[in-house]
Amino acid sequence: MAIDLSLIINEKEKKGSIESQICHLTERIKRLTLHLKKHSKDYSSRKGLYKIVRRRKSLLVYLTKNNFVCYEKLISQLGLRRLKTH
């Protein structure tokens, strides 16, 4: 279940890079999703999940504007869908 960051991110980028933040948020989203499948009426966890999803989306938007090649590589490795463009 855990995402192997060493496959996605270089050694010197592991701490606070945008890519590592997106990976960590994706892992938290997966854990919270499993929790909410068992406890469907846990509304505070659901609110926290929505907050994490918004944070990941804003980081993905930032990454598309600054480094589109890295964005494409990251979403393919994490199995995420592309962002909708307006």
Swiss-Prot record:
SMART domains: Ribosomal_S15. InterPro entries: Ribosomal_uS15 (IPR000589), Ribosomal_uS15_bac-type (IPR005290), uS15_NS1_RNA-bd_sf (IPR009068). GO terms for cellular component: chloroplast; ribonucleoprotein complex; ribosome. One of its GO terms (biological process) is translation. Pfam families: Ribosomal_S15. It is found in: Plastid, Chloroplast. SUPFAM superfamilies: S15/NS1 RNA-binding domain (SSF47060). One of its GO terms (molecular function) is structural constituent of ribosome. Belongs to the universal ribosomal protein uS15 family. Part of the 30S ribosomal subunit. This is Small ribosomal subunit protein uS15c. It comes from Psilotum nudum.
